[in-house]
Regions:
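C-terminal region of N-terminal signal peptides and the immediate post-cleavage residues
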Residues: 4-22
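Extracytoplasmic low-complexity, Pro/Thr/Ser/Ala/Gly-rich segments
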Residues: 16-40, 130
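Alpha-helical transmembrane bundles and membrane-interface segments of multipass inner-membrane proteins
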Residues: 16-20, 29, 60, 78, ...
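Glycine-centered beta-turn/loop sites at beta-strand termini
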Residues: 26-30, 36, 45, 54, ...
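Glycine/tyrosine- and acidic-biased, solvent-exposed loop/turn segments at the edges of beta-strands
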Residues: 85, 95, 135-139
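Leucine-rich solenoid repeat scaffolds
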Residues: 107-140
Length: 140
């Protein structure tokens, strides 16, 4: 499902690939709290410092601008924080997590094989031995 996405390239062209997904749940230009459904969701926070919980299902979470908090929930999810100092947690499943620009914090010690990319900025990650990590400078 996520194979067609250029998940971890550090270029604006590839980061835009995340935004080409059709949003099924959309926030506003301000801070939002958004929850996914039990199925597959594409949740777009847009502007503001958003809190997004994907819930069950294989979801795509896009924080957008702001200091966002993204939680994938159950399922194999794709999380993209966007510009800002974001906090991202994949939760259960083989997740792909991209922090984007800013000083991001990523949690992925769930026993699944996750792919983590902090993006530009000084990023911090907690991971387990199954995870593949790029562009992260600090580990917990």
């Amino acid at each position: 499902m996520f194979a067609s996405l250029a998940l971890f390239a550090a270029t604006k062209a590839h980061a835009a690939t995340y935004h080409s997904q059709a949003c099924t749940i959309t926030g506003t230009s301000g801070p939002d709290i958004l929850f996914g459904t039990p199925g597959r969701d594409v949740i777009c926070g847009l502007g503001g410092s958003d809190r997004i919980d994907g819930g069950r299902g294989n979801d795509v979470l896009i924080g957008g601008a702001g200091a966002d908090l993204l939680g994938g929930g159950e399922g194999s999810d794709l999380l993209y924080g966007g510009p800002g100092n974001d906090k991202l947690q994949g939760d259960g499943g083989n997740d792909a997590v991209y922090g984007g620009a800013g000083q991001d914090t990523i949690w992925a010690w769930d026993g699944y094989a996750d792919r983590l990319n902090g993006g530009s900025g000084v990023d911090h990650a907690w991971k387990d031995k199954l995870d593949r990590v790029t562009e992260v400078e600090r580990f917990g």
